[in-house]
């Protein structure tokens, strides 16, 4: 598939739930959350059909996200089903790691080669302050077990002024002894109504400057095709570093991805308000061809970049959008 700006679309991010067992303040409020009802959520059968249609249209990679995907019952059976889709080249998962460790051998058998692990700090007390849950040991256990099973690990850390700036260098230090990719992400205004977010102070330039102060030999390395991050390596380190300009939005020109929320809404940009409810089409009995045509029409009316897309959006929580 190609959009109206000539960008190839071959990557789908599918959020299977809006629920999460952590309460990271930048993602969702700690209390007063309006969870989606079971009726509003797509069933796994509906998701499988949508994924099958998408793969036939040219989607080669599917990332499973949430909320936290592993809190939804039946997720492993669903992963088994989509792993059998002919033409799908890669399945990846974004998880907070709390429930993941016992499932890693099965994930390996399913052919999962890469997992993104959300980890904003290496300090247990700060972890609790950010997530409101004391689950730091479980997340670290997941990281080490993923590496033991030869599954690529990307650590995603949201950089927040006054919250975890002191963790930037310790997280970079992880790459010295471990073959992990540590990715620092600009904070985005998707906390579902919490007013803590004011203005971005730590952009991708400032993050890199902070790292360079401690690691002056850091080198820029080639970014993979369609990469959302600026990628770096420190000589002598086993891992790498990425900086994602999520708020600055400097990667829109090569964006190859679309999102589907837990309630089946297609988002052709993280920042748009949703452009098509695919779940409704499925429940209305539309054929695969009709759904494909609706998807193509939506992709052919895609915003040029996140700034244009944001003009029509409302700031939902990241859990509801699909992290």
Range-by-range predicted roles:
Residues 1-15, 23-25, 56, 229-244, ...:
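N-terminal [4Fe-4S]-dependent radical SAM core
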Residues 4-42, 270:
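Canonical Radical SAM [4Fe-4S] cluster-binding loop centered on the CxxxCxxC motif
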Residues 16, 20, 64, 93, ...:
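Conserved, mostly hydrophobic/aromatic
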Residues 22, 124-125, 250, 276:
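Glycine-centered loop/turn positions within well-structured domains
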Residues 32-37, 123-130, 191-195, 277-278:
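A short acidic, helix-capping loop that chelates divalent metal ions and anchors anionic groups
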Residues 41-64, 68-185:
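Radical SAM/AdoMet-radical enzyme domain recognition
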Residues 156, 183-187, 222, 243-244:
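Short, conserved beta-strand edge motifs with alternating hydrophobic and charged residues
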Residues 191-307:
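Accessory C-terminal segments flanking Radical SAM cores
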